[in-house]
Curated annotation (Swiss-Prot):
Catalytic activity: Couples ATP hydrolysis with the unwinding of duplex DNA by translocating in the 3'-5' direction; ATP + H2O = ADP + phosphate + H(+)
Organism of derivation: Staphylococcus aureus (strain MRSA252)
Chain's role: The heterodimer acts as both an ATP-dependent DNA helicase and an ATP-dependent, dual-direction single-stranded exonuclease. Recognizes the chi site generating a DNA molecule suitable for the initiation of homologous recombination. The AddA nuclease domain is required for chi fragment generation; this subunit has the helicase and 3' -> 5' nuclease activities.
Necessary cofactors: Mg(2+)
Pfam families (UniProt xref): PDDEXK_1, UvrD-helicase, UvrD_C
GO cellular component, one term: DNA helicase complex
Protein name per Swiss-Prot or TrEMBL: ATP-dependent helicase/nuclease subunit A
Gene label: addA
């Protein structure tokens, strides 16, 4: 079908129009950031339905997330409705309104699940399977690995013994287990995991593959050796211009001869490189040499710098690539082959046993979804099955969003259900490889890259490629600067794709022509002498200043109206690679009273509040773990001081465990009595919680801990309180999820958490801020993908890349397999193997490439203006970055591969554009006119030196004086000295009042007097009983299950607050109508109606008290009060007390001139056998006598009239006080 001609005036660009209508072959749409790919995808679906008459359920639309799927289905449904309204007689559109609900617009996992549910018989599995929870899956896999390793310990194969010697430590085999897990997850990301594992040994056995790895390293070495030779020659040229440096030149000439031999004939002689020493030490530059070359001081420094660079580049090649002869590297591969083969065997055993366990429990995980789907769709020889053929016949087209984030299993599934080859297929793919940032999810961008390079713009003989390059999001300054940076940063060698004219961004948004340059702000840290703040804290304060400047000076352009409005908090986002800076930023913004939110899902287990709860759980599980026991003791909950812990240990210095020391201290006659009482209370809590944990699930134990110690309330009051509270809820919810698995108990839950920590798996805060809340946001680049903001502050640019994975004993790669060092068991020495060296080099290249893509995502989030924040310790390092070598249009490959952080590259590229002092051979262009408009950067570079006002010296040391110094001074006015001493010695007369709360609720006062009567100290109550306030219920508890008693109490109070009082009384029907009215007004939620105790309310309506209130002259409901406690003087007081009492009285009515108050109680109580109603009434009155007395005295104080009161118990009746 041909593409329809584009009418005049349509909103679509030519490339978008082609993307909507192109058909007849596989299509890959390379959609740059902000190019409207989602709108294009939706429009293509709509035109398939409207123009081509295709039923919506004959389209398979695959999205990356469930949220994306829901949004896309909603947008398609809306468009179908609009079309149906415009053409009500269209039967096809009416059918689509029905079929949209069955439409396959979902994630690939959801599609696979439906496939399994429909064809479970092919798999021979029980159709009543369920999806395992994350907790269950992790623990089951961990259990499986334990069992499989134990089996192999029984066999004790020599290769297994060597493996454990190499990959386990003296203390544990945790590292060995971790490697097995990693291999398992890598393998199941392949269409045939077993085959992938079997091929791991191939490079260790076959010389042909070893030769390929040697060549890979040689090619990479050539990059660094060539750069080293260039640096050496530059050093020689510079020294040649100077006097008195003959010895220096002689050293360099020797090095040049060695390097010439290595590079002889244009090839790298690896044997010569490994067999000789390079980088001889240069003679010192003496004062005489400096004097002789006083006019060339800079050249002298440059010469030394170039020789230093030469040495570092050669050292990298010799240490990272060829630390030994190539033949030795190959020989080690043969020795490692049996170990690699046996490791693959263990992982296959784990896979087999893990699958067996899942089948026995009738559970599936997400990996099963994909592999079972493949099993359904393929025959044993890998060809499409009959079921696959039926899906090929059914689906008119398959549309894949975010194609750059697919893995090889998903690619295989898609290939089974698509029709034709690339030149005549029905697969439509949309994505941007420059935004492929999910390597940790096994995303494989090479799938996109292979098609991008293979498909052509005309689609001749293969698939068709369409480039969507016009950006409708950002101002031209953001786009041109981004283009300039990536034009010189990204290519096939580093970045995996060339950033050429087809890849760059083109301006397409209707902004005005006002100037909005990108701002690169370089913060030079103040040293410890000039600031008490760390470098990170200085950067956080600096960011706040940028935000304040934006709010004060910047405007946001409204493209619809063509007018400006003032910038608000929500217009600003701070992007960072991770959340490491979150707490510093929270503090800095709090200091300036600027609303700020971090939706952190990283570093979760490092948060103070989470560490506290985990220490509690670990201490309850096993109090012999000193770190967690002492951590709990030192926490805000128990508040043991360091000197108290020291006292405990001093009396028992030789105990193995601190718990033993506590017990011994309690029993020691020399122990401090107060500390002993405190310890007894602590141990009593521990034992109580241990007993509780035996009979209750983990989430109830956590809930009890939260309630007992008011954990939620405490952390809610700290900086970032909403996020901290969400973190605590997150842990509680995880315990619920754990409880729903087949595992139970505190020990297993802790093991589950340990596994999450080991895998770096975070599940942090719920999103406590909505998209329209007016706050400054901080988020990671990953979480910002797909979003846009008027002002983007991209900070943390100077934080180094995380290269931890490159230091692991085993390097994994989907394409190449497994790289392992050679470990000599007899000598207990490890050596780099050919595979470990080669795969590490490949991994480093891929890591830097993905970091570049993260930078691209960050830069392209900005609409109005982009701020880049870098930080250096001194400005000398900037000069080095300006001097980075280039190769053609790019920063040299060796510089990019060894770049430590994004700032290293960004500053180097932009400074080369602006600095006039940089030599032409280090610039990309000699004249700005050479740059195309689309990539001509508009950037302001500012270098700011941090100044910390808080540490400025106000007084010299000799200006400080103490009271004692004043007394010893022999001169001066005695009257003035006496007056100063009086001021400094002044004692505040009401110091006791500072130890009491300034405001107390009636409930707190009630509790205080109750505890005093029972012998509990007031300080203890204040420390642990902050005032009753239940924390918000997690979402899953609010939506299902039974409500707690206190929640039902609140609900009943809400109903009673609005209850009408009529002399004729209201009927049960009217009561239901009244409740429905509360729901309609959103006073209460609809799902709460079932928990309202209608019979108890009807009992109250039929009571004498209801009639009395109905006949009253005046009725006041829910009356709050705040009163000075000193005025309420009818209860026993100590010294004059100026505390404030606050409370809420349920109802007050006036009858015959007398004021009465009513307090509703929903308490449940035990009616002991033989107790009369009168005895129960007396018992209930005594329970609330203090609270009621406060209410009565408070009202009498306020009203200056006699006040009487009623208690109404829904489960007992009326009590008059």
């Amino acid at each position: 079908m041909t593409i329809p001609e584009k009418p005049q005036g349509v909103i679509w660009t030519d490339a978008q129009w082609q993307s909507i209508y192109e058909t007849g072959q596989d299509v890959l749409v390379a959609a740059a950031a902000g190019s409207g790919k989602t709108a294009v995808l939706v429009e293509r679906i709509i035109q398939k339905i409207l123009r081509d008459g295709i039923d919506v359920d004959r389209l398979l639309v695959v999205t990356f997330t469930n949220l994306s799927a829901r949004e896309m289905k909603h947008r398609v449904d809306q468009r179908i409705q609009e079309a149906s309204i415009a053409d009500p007689a269209n039967a096809h559109l009416k059918n689509q309104r029905i079929k949209i609900h069955q439409a396959q617009i979902s994630t690939l996992h959801s599609f696979c699940l439906k496939l399994i549910q429909q064809h479970y018989d092919v798999l021979n599995i029980d159709p009543n399977f369920r999806t395992s929870s994350e907790a269950e899956n992790i623990l089951l896999l961990e259990q499986t690995i334990d069992e499989v390793i134990e089996q192999h310990y029984d066999i004790l194969d020599p290769a297994f013994i060597e493996l454990t010697e190499q990959l386990s430590s003296d203390r544990s085999d945790d590292q060995f287990r971790m490697i097995i897990k990693q291999l398992y997850f890598f393998s199941v990301a392949n269409p045939n995991p077993t085959n992938w594992l079997d091929q791991l040994v191939t490079p260790y056995e076959e010389e042909a593959q070893q030769a390929q790895l040697i060549q890979l390293l040689t090619d990479l070495s050539k990059v660094f050796i060539t750069a080293a030779y260039d640096a050496l020659n530059k050093a020689y040229d510079l020294f040649s211009m100077m006097d008195g440096v003959d010895k220096h030149l002689a050293v360099i000439e020797d090095e040049r001869r060695l390097m010439g031999r290595v590079l002889e004939g244009g090839f790298i002689d690896i044997s010569y490189l490994t067999g000789h020493e390079f980088g001889a030490r240069l003679p010192n530059v003496t004062a005489k040499i400096k004097e002789a070359n006083e006019m060339m001081v800079d050249a002298l420094e440059d010469a030394k710098l170039q020789y230093k660079k030469y040495k570092s580049l050669i050292d990298k090649v010799k240490s990272d690539y060829f630390s030994r002869e190539a033949d030795d590297l190959k020989a080690d591969m043969q020795q490692l082959a049996p170990r690699v083969k046996y490791l693959a065997r263990i992982v296959k055993d784990v896979m087999s046993e893990f699958n067996r366990k899942k089948r026995s429990k009738n559970i599936l995980d997400f990996s099963d979804y994909e592999h079972f789907a493949l099993q359904i769709l393929t025959n044993e020889d890998g060809s499409p099955s009959e079921i696959a053929e039926s899906y090929r016949q059914h689906f008119h087209e398959i549309l894949v969003d975010e194609y750059q984030d697919t893995n090889r299993v998903q690619e295989k599934i898609l290939s089974c259900i698509k029709t034709g080859d690339e030149h005549n297929g029905n697969l439509f793919m949309v994505g941007d490889v420059k935004q492929s940032i999910y390597k940790f999810r096994q995303a494989d961008p090479s799938l996109f890259i292979e098609k991008y390079q293979r498909f052509t713009l005309d689609g001749d003989g293969t698939g068709r490629r369409i480039d969507l390059s016009q950006n409708f999001r950002s101002r031209k300054e953001v786009l041109s600067t981004t283009n300039y940076i990536f034009k010189h940063m990204m290519d096939e060698q580093v970045g995996e794709v060339r950033y050429d004219e087809a890849a760059q961004l083109y301006y397409g948004a209707p902004y005005d022509e006002s100037d909005h340059p990108v701002n690169l702000k370089v913060l030079v840290e103040a040293d410890q002498e000039h600031s008490d703040l760390t470098g990170s804290e200085q950067e956080a304060h600096f960011i706040v200043e940028q935000v304040k400047d934006i709010l004060e000076h910047q405007k946001v352009f409204d493209m619809k109206t063509g007018s400006y409005r003032s910038a608000t908090y929500k217009d600003i986002v701070i992007l960072e690679r991770s959340f490491g800076q979150a707490r510093n930023l929270q503090q800095a913004f709090k200091n300036e009273d600027i609303p700020f939110h971090v939706n952190s899902r990283e570093g979760y287990f490092e948060q103070t509040e989470v560490r506290l709860v985990l220490s509690f759980l670990r201490a309850i599980d096993n109090p012999l773990q000193d770190i967690y026991l002492v951590g709990l003791m030192r926490s805000v909950i128990y508040q043991f001081k360091e000197d108290e812990l020291a006292q405990i240990r001093i009396l028992s210095p030789n105990d193995d465990y601190f718990y033993q020391s506590i017990v011994n201290y309690i029993n020691d006659e020399a122990a401090d009595a107060i500390l002993v009482d405190k310890l007894k209370m602590f141990l009593s809590d521990i034992q109580s919680y241990q007993q509780y944990s035996k009979d209750h699930p983990v989430y109830q134990l956590i809930d009890k801990f939260y309630n007992d110690h008011y954990v939620i309330q405490y952390f809610s009051g700290l900086i970032g309180g909403r996020g901290r509270r969400a973190n605590l809820y997150g842990l509680f919810n995880k315990a619920i999820e754990f409880e729903n698995s087949s595992f139970r108990g505190l020990y297993q839950f802790i093991r589950f958490i340990d596994e999450l920590i080991e895998r770096g798996k975070d599940f942090g805060e719920e999103n406590v801020v909505g998209p329209n809340d007016n706050v400054v946001r901080m988020m990671t680049i990953h979480s910002s993908k797909g979003l846009e903001f008027p002002f983007v502050i991209y900070s943390g640019l100077s934080k180094d890349f995380n290269k931890r994975d490159l230091k692991q004993p085993v390097i994994l790669n989907q394409q190449f397999g497994l790289g392992m060092d050679y470990f000599d068991v007899d000598k207990e020495m490890a050596f780099p193997s050919l595979a470990s060296v080669a795969y590490k080099a490949v991994a480093e290249k891929k890591l830097v490439s993905e970091e570049m893509r993260l930078v691209y995502v960050a830069l392209t989030r900005a609409k109005e203006q982009l701020y880049l924040i870098g930080r250096v310790k001194n400005d000398k390092s900037l000069l080095e970055l300006e001097q980075l070598s280039i190769s053609g249009e790019h920063i040299a490959v060796n510089e990019r591969l060894t770049s430590p952080n994004p700032f290293h590259l960004i500053y180097s590229i932009l400074s080369k554009h602006q600095s006039a002092s940089i030599p032409d051979d280090l610039k990309f262009e000699k004249d700005i006119a050479q740059i195309e408009d689309s990539s001509r950067p508009n950037v302001n570079i500012s270098i700011i030196y941090f100044e910390d006002v808080s540490t400025e010296t106000i007084l010299d040391n000799d200006e400080y004086r103490s009271v004692n110094q004043l007394e010893t001074m022999q001169n001066g006015n005695e009257d003035v000295k006496a007056q100063i001493k009086h001021q400094l010695d002044y004692q505040y007369p009401y110091v006791n009042d500072t130890k009491k709360p300034s405001k107390q609720s009636v409930s707190e006062l009630k509790r205080q007097y109750e505890t005093e009567e029972s012998g509990t100290s007031y300080e203890r109550v204040r420390q642990y009983r902050i005032g009753f306030s239940t924390y918000e219920r997690p979402k899953f508890l609010s939506e299902q299950g039974k409500r707690k008693a206190n929640e039902i109490g609140t609900l009943m109070h809400t109903v009673m607050q609005h209850l009408p009082f009529k002399k004729e009384r209201i009927s049960e029907v009217e009561l239901h109508q009244y409740i429905d009215g509360l729901i309609d007004k959103h006073i209460i939620e609809a799902d709460t109606k079932k928990d309202i105790r209608m019979d108890e309310i009807m009992t109250f309506i039929n009571s004498e008290l209801y009639s009395i209130i109905a006949e009253a002259e005046q009725v006041y409901r829910e009356l709050p009060f705040v009163v000075n406690q000193a005025l309420v003087d009818q209860l026993p007081q100590g010294d004059e007390d100026v505390s404030i009492i606050q409370g809420m009285i349920d109802l007050i009515f006036v009858k015959d001139g007398v004021h009465y108050f009513v307090d509703y109680k929903t308490d449940a109580f035990n009616r002991r056998r033989g107790m009369t109603d009168e005895e129960i009434g007396t018992q209930l009155k005594n329970k609330y006598k203090i609270q009621m007395k406060y209410y009565q005295n408070t009202l009498q104080t306020i009203l200056n009239k006699e006040v009487k009161g009623y208690l109404y118990f829904f489960k007992f009746g009326t009590l008059q006080l």
